[in-house]
């Protein structure tokens, strides 16, 4: 390595396992207008099991006594959404010690893409739509989410072949 910046980049290589993208189970997703200051598995279903009603202006539900208004958002055509989680090293390596792992790599060398990665991700579910919720009102067209979902069609338009006259 030439400098510490390159060392930092080297330690952030992530590999998304392609075999997990083949047939992940479909999921029902809800984007809630709140922040949870914890980054670990939690029994969300215990706290949010939506009784969704169709109101005059769209979907309605409540969360801990607060009124939520929402709408279904469809993933752009030609794309699929995935729920991705980090796979633990013990699961990947079968809790082998270094000597056993080195012997295993001699018999079955890791794929070139996996060799230099220190984090591995896998898809646990897929989705083609999700429900986005707002407090008291439906998130408007200016929401950051709408901007992010408009990029695929914008990129396709920019990179499309221009017909000759």
Curated annotation (Swiss-Prot):
Q: Which UniProt keywords apply?
A: Acetylation, Nucleus
Q: Which residues carry this modification: N-acetylmethionine?
A: 1
Q: Where in the cell is it found?
A: Nucleus
Enumerate the CDD domains for this protein. RNase_H2-C (cd09271)
Main location per UniProt?
A: nucleus
- Gene Ontology, cellular component aspect: nucleus; ribonuclease H2 complex
Q: Per the UniProt entry, what is one GO biological process?
A: RNA catabolic process
InterPro entries associated with the record:
RNase_H2_subunit_C (IPR052863), RNase_H2_suC (IPR013924)
Short name of one Pfam family for this protein?
Answer: RNase_H2_suC
In its keyword annotation, does this UniProt entry include rRNA processing?
A: no
The UniProt similarity line reads:
Belongs to the RNase H2 subunit C family.
Outline the subunit composition: The RNase H2 complex is a heterotrimer composed of the catalytic subunit RNASEH2A and the non-catalytic subunits RNASEH2B and RNASEH2C.
Functionally, this protein is described as follows: Non catalytic subunit of RNase H2, an endonuclease that specifically degrades the RNA of RNA:DNA hybrids. Participates in DNA replication, possibly by mediating the removal of lagging-strand Okazaki fragment RNA primers during DNA replication. Mediates the excision of single ribonucleotides from DNA:RNA duplexes.
* Official protein name in the record: Ribonuclease H2 subunit C
Q: Which organism is it from?
A: Bos taurus (Bovine)
């Amino acid at each position: 390595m030439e400098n510490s910046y390159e060392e930092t980049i080297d330690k952030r290589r992530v590999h998304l396992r392609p075999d997990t993208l083949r047939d992940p189970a479909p999921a029902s997703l809800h984007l809630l207008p709140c922040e949870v200051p914890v980054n670990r598995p939690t029994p969300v279903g215990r706290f949010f099991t939506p009784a969704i009603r169709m109101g005059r202006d769209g979907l309605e539900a409540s969360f801990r006594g607060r009124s939520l208004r929402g709408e279904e958002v469809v993933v752009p055509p030609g794309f699929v959404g995935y729920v991705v989680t980090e796979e633990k090293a013990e699961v990947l390596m079968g809790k082998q010690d270094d000597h056993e792992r080195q012997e295993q790599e001699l018999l079955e060398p890791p794929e070139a893409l996996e060799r230099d990665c220190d984090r591995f991700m896998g898809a646990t579910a897929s989705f083609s739509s999700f429900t986005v919720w707002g407090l008291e009102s439906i998130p408007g067209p200016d929401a950051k989410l709408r901007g992010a979902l408009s990029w695929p069609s914008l990129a396709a338009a920019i990179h499309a072949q221009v017909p000759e006259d």
